[in-house]
Design a protein with these regions (language model features):
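Helix-coil modules at protein/domain termini and other flexible surface or pore-lining loops
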Residues: 2-201
Length: 201
């Protein structure tokens, strides 16, 4: 076992010193998908297939981007996926069989400039919103949650563009982003949209 870093949190030092391991993801990637079928379950499976994670046993978790976690591309992340593996992911999903109804699912992400601090992920889903509208909302939610932990004073009623400028000036938040899947429900069945941030250990 390696030397425990002196600046590691006390809880982490205690666990490592006792020979225990904390389940903290080292990497994360974003993915999204959409599926349509006459059966709701099959539409969900097809959405997962479109996202490339249908072979995983997915465990839904919330909503912290771990310290020193690396955000990687989907192509890179898929190299770590193995059929049947227990896969922890922050997921957003919505389903409908109301023909021509617009819907979206989104994961927002806000990462602090100090990599030793944690960031936030938000799950958001909505009807009647475009991909951009849902994505901006999810990103806004994640950034607002992170800002509140960093002591950045913001007006929640400001537009996302105004808040984004405040975050940029504060120099505390290095990156905000989102992954969003929108779709119009197909006639004669169910349509499901899925967005996910998938953790790799």
């Amino acid at each position: 076992m390696g030397v425990v870093p002196g600046n590691a949190p006390v809880a982490l030092q205690n666990h490592l010193s006792n020979g225990q391991q904390l389940l903290v993801p080292k990497k994360m990637f974003f993915t999204k998908g959409v599926g349509s079928h006459k059966h709701e379950l099959r539409s969900f499976e097809l959405a997962l297939r479109d996202a490339g994670i249908e072979k995983c046993n997915i465990v839904h978790v919330s909503s912290i981007f771990p310290p020193n976690c690396e955000l990687i591309s989907k192509n890179e992340g898929m190299k770590y996926i193995y059929p049947g593996m227990i896969t922890f992911a922050v997921t957003a999903r919505t389903t409908s069989n109301e023909a021509r109804r617009l819907m979206a699912a989104s994961i927002g992400c806000a990462i602090p400039s100090d990599s030793n601090k944690y960031g936030y992920l938000s799950e958001y889903y909505a009807f009647g919103q475009t991909e951009k509208e849902a994505g901006d909302t999810a990103e806004d939610l994640a950034a607002a949650m992170l800002a509140s932990t960093l002591g950045i004073d913001i007006d929640e009623d400001k537009s996302w563009d105004e808040k984004e400028e405040i975050f940029r000036i504060s120099d505390e938040i290095v990156k905000t982003t989102n992954v969003t899947q929108s779709a119009m429900v197909e006639k004669g069945g169910y349509t499901t949209v899925v967005a996910a941030g998938v953790f790799i250990f």
